[in-house]
């Protein structure tokens, strides 16, 4: 093989060492789709209830650096068609929308609503987008603690608190955001933009829970 993908943090060091000796690139990623599918199928035939082959122990979420905090943010939706075509003609510096996550790959129609979050980063927009890219984001999820918040799962097991809130109306919107994700195979997106002018964007990521 030319590449080995690893999704378990505990396995990373050992496999990376072996890969160097064999001249094989080792990539840390949670997107080991075929492997996880096979492990899940095996788990269905395993009678030990404690056997969770896809379970990863994650540390408590950490707040993002204060200097990266955006000016404001909001929940939004785009149709599957808009998500695929809306950003093609825009000169966005950071775009992460792999083909295997695009709505057509999941059999979703053009008018299906894909939930997302926009962060208006102001003067720090590009800096925030670069930081998010470096974390290798996987999903952006609502945690309904008190206060509630949106947590970015990234890398192999990292978790970052992007925003917090305790407003009941925002909490209801967050629950709707999560419900919509479940209707579209966990697909959602994160857009970082300087402001709401619609003229420029800093980065967009298509994510999946």
Enumerate the language-model features and the residues they cover.
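Secondary-structure boundary/capping micro-motif
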Residues: 1-209
